Amino acid sequence: MTKLENDTFIRALLRQPVDYTPVWMMRQAGRYLPEYNQTRARAGSFLSLCKNPDFATEVTLQPLARFSLDAAILFSDILTIPDAMGLGLYFADGEGPRFERPLREEREIRSLIVPDPDTHLRYVTDAVRQIRTALNNRVPLIGFSGSPFTLACYMVEGAGSSEFRQIKTMLYARPDLLHHILGVTAQAVTAYLNAQIEAGAQAVMIFDSWGGALSHAAYQEFSLRYMNQILDGLKREHNGDRIPNILFTKGGGLWLESIMASGCDAIGLDWTIDIGEARRRTQDKVALQGNLDPAVLFSSPEVIAAEAGKILASYGHGHGHVFNLGHGISQFTPPENALALIEAVHAQSVRYHTD
C-alpha cells in the first residue's frame, strides 16, 4: 500500500473522515499560469506538450508549486484516444482541436479498432510514472479520460460544436453506427484508464463534457450506458490501494440518481445545481465533487471566499465532499484568485468536519 503525505482527497472520495474539505481545480495546469505558457512555448505546440512526458510532468507540477492543492491531475488531453485511433488530431490557431478524418462513412466506422495503450498511448503512461516519481507521494495523482459520447462528438463532428448536427443526425438516423463507435470507444477508455492505474494513477475521472446536450432518454442510452460499461471493467484496486473514480457530466444535474446507480464512487457537479440538494438526492451514497462557477474567480478575494462559503454551507457537516469548480478554470483567471479560493476552502471547511 502507498503511504501518502496528504490523502485527504482519496479519503473524501471514499467518504471517510477528513479534517477539512480537499480542493483541486479542473484544468489547474493551464493557460492562466504564466509558467505554463512559458513551458508551452518551449514545447512548440500543445500536442508536443502532451506527448512529451518531461513537459507533461513539468506542467502537471506547476500548480502544486504555487498552491496547496490536495491532488494533482495528469496533464493530457481527452482526445488522445481518437488520435491513437488514427483520426489525425491537430490544433488550428484560435479554433481548438480538429480531426483530419472525422467519422462519417460506415466503412470507416466499422473499421475502428481499440488502440493498445502500451504502444499507441505509451507517452501518457510514461508521463504518469514520471509524475508519480516527481510527486514522491506528496498528494495523489488523478488520471482521466473523456467519456465515449464526448469523444464520439469530436470524432463525428470533426471539431467542437454548438449544435451537434452531425452526431445527432447519426444518433437518430443511424443509431447502430453510433452504438458501434461508442462500444469501441468504451473498450478503449477502459483499457486506457486501467493502463493509467497500472502506471500509478491513484484516482480516475471520466469527463462527459457533452452528455448534457442529450435528451433524457438519449443520455441513458448513448452516454451513461457506456460509462457504466467502463466502470464494469475498471480496476478498483491496485497494489493494495483503492482507486476511486469520478463521473462528471456537464449539465447532468437532472440525472444524479441514474449516475449514482452506475456504482461510481463520486459524481462531479457543474455549477447549475445546488450541492446541498444533490447531497439530499444521493443520500450520502456517493461522494460529490464541485461546484463553484469558474466565473466567480474573475471577482475579488472577498467575493470568492463568500461564494466558496455558500457551497460549503450548502453541503453541510460531514464527509464525502471534494471542492472543485463546476468546469475548467478559465485562461483569464488571475492566479492570485485561484490562491484565494484554495485558502478560503481550507480555512472555512474545518468547521464542517468537527463533531
UniProtKB/Swiss-Prot annotation:
GO terms for molecular function: uroporphyrinogen decarboxylase activity. The keyword Cytoplasm applies. It catalyses: uroporphyrinogen III + 4 H(+) = coproporphyrinogen III + 4 CO2. The keyword Lyase applies. GO terms for cellular component: cytosol. It is found in: Cytoplasm. Keywords: Cytoplasm, Decarboxylase, Lyase, Porphyrin biosynthesis. Belongs to the uroporphyrinogen decarboxylase family. This is Uroporphyrinogen decarboxylase. It comes from Nitrosomonas europaea (strain ATCC 19718 / CIP 103999 / KCTC 2705 / NBRC 14298). The gene is hemE.
